[in-house]
Amino acid sequence: MAKVSELDVQLIAATAFHAPQGVDWEVDEGASESEALVEFAGRACYESFDKPNPRTASNQAYLHHILEVGHDALLEHATATLYIRGLSRSASHELVRHRHFSFSQLSQRFVHSEEAEVVLPKFIAEDEQLTRLTLQAADEARFVYEELLDALESKLEEEPNALLRKKQARQAARAVLPNLTESRIVVTGNYRAWRHFIGARATEQADTEMRQLAVTCLKLLREQSPVLFDDFHITTLADGTEMASSPYA
């Protein structure tokens, strides 16, 4: 029986900020490096390192002002990289439509799908009979995949390059793998792009799996740079899932 995978998202890299020499400006204690960089970039536009406006003197107040007035281009200077596992292949195709991100995704051409897990949609996972039926379909697809793989490798046996032979066989056989096959992907984006993704995909109208991913990303990014994401409000829907919204997204 196919093994079910659960969503797992980890922050693996984020912006490091090094204040330049010769600039009379100090980073607020407690500000993340991403938050410090965004503030520095904004103050660099106007040479306001002396913080002349008391209403935006602190890092938190300055960044909140940036979001309020829509000067979010400054957020493009800070980036975060997340490693996502337990995402269905179908959901990954929605994710890669966000073209301001950079992606490195698990290759079905090079990696044998023998051990690949599956991701069940919420409404299927909640029903024992539907779960059994879906896992049965996944097992049958895996069986056909293995049969095709063996047949294709035999068909390509005259190819002297073993690596090329396996790659050609897998790239053809993967056509029968279902959309619920788990994918793994590294995603890097600037904070403006992450905010756009969360604003678009954490809504009640979004696909359930994508909404779960967006809310999970929000929670991680808010831990890393709380001021840049604390305008998002997370609420629980009637079905027990979560959504997020912001007046600025």
Swiss-Prot record:
EC number: 2.1.1.148
Active site: 201
Binding-site residues, dUMP: 94-97, 105-109, 174, 201
Domain ThyX: 7-235
InterPro entries noted in UniProt: Thymidylate_synthase_ThyX, Thymidylate_synthase_ThyX_sf
Catalysed reaction equations from the record: dUMP + (6R)-5,10-methylene-5,6,7,8-tetrahydrofolate + NADPH + H(+) = dTMP + (6S)-5,6,7,8-tetrahydrofolate + NADP(+)
Keyword Transmembrane helix carried by entry: no
Sequence positions that bind FAD: 97-99, 105, 190-192, 196
Extent of motif ThyX motif: 97-107
Molecular function (Gene Ontology), one example: thymidylate synthase (FAD) activity
Pathway: Pyrimidine metabolism; dTTP biosynthesis
Cofactor note as given: Binds 4 FAD per tetramer. Each FAD binding site is formed by three monomers.
The UniProt record lists the keyword Transferase: yes
Xref: SUPFAM superfamilies: Thymidylate synthase-complementing protein Thy1
CDD domains, sorted: ThyX
Keywords, ordered alphabetically: FAD, Flavoprotein, Methyltransferase, NADP, Nucleotide biosynthesis, Transferase
Biological-process GO terms, alphabetical: dTMP biosynthetic process; dTTP biosynthetic process; methylation
Purpose of the protein: Catalyzes the reductive methylation of 2'-deoxyuridine-5'-monophosphate (dUMP) to 2'-deoxythymidine-5'-monophosphate (dTMP) while utilizing 5,10-methylenetetrahydrofolate (mTHF) as the methyl donor, and NADPH and FADH(2) as the reductant.
Entry similarity comment: Belongs to the thymidylate synthase ThyX family.
Assembly and binders: Homotetramer.
NCBIfam families cross-referenced by the UniProt entry: thyX
PANTHER family: FLAVIN-DEPENDENT THYMIDYLATE SYNTHASE
UniProt-recorded name of the protein: Flavin-dependent thymidylate synthase
